[in-house]
Amino acid sequence: EVISTGYVGAPRGRKNCSDLGYCIRQQLNIPRGERYELCRSVHAEANAIISAEREKMIDSTLYLVGKEVGTGAYIEKSSSCSMCKRQIINAGIARVFIRDSRNEYRMVEVQDWIENDESLEFKNDDLIRASFVKFSSY
């Protein structure tokens, strides 16, 4: 059962880079996998999680495929960015299948992302900021 789908694109009502005719990350020569906070899009993983029912995501499988916009070629060795990994963990998703080519796939156990916490590589307290969001109804 498919419980949700997601795509990479600008937030609702905003223009995509392809509509604007430029990408700020490309203009700044930012390598793939870095500085996604500068990207104007919402990643496919995040869009899928936003659209899904929480109960159905518990112990689910996420299928991820990335293609180059210009060529349509599969993005080999693709991986979720650190922000999407955190969202996948909190959503309760158990595994991620990543398509590397027409016939090649990898499976990642989300538990591995939990046990091998890449965010601990940062030691500088100045890089760490705590944010809290409170939701309330009126």
Identify the function of each model-found stretch.
Residues 1-138:
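Zinc-dependent deaminase catalytic domain
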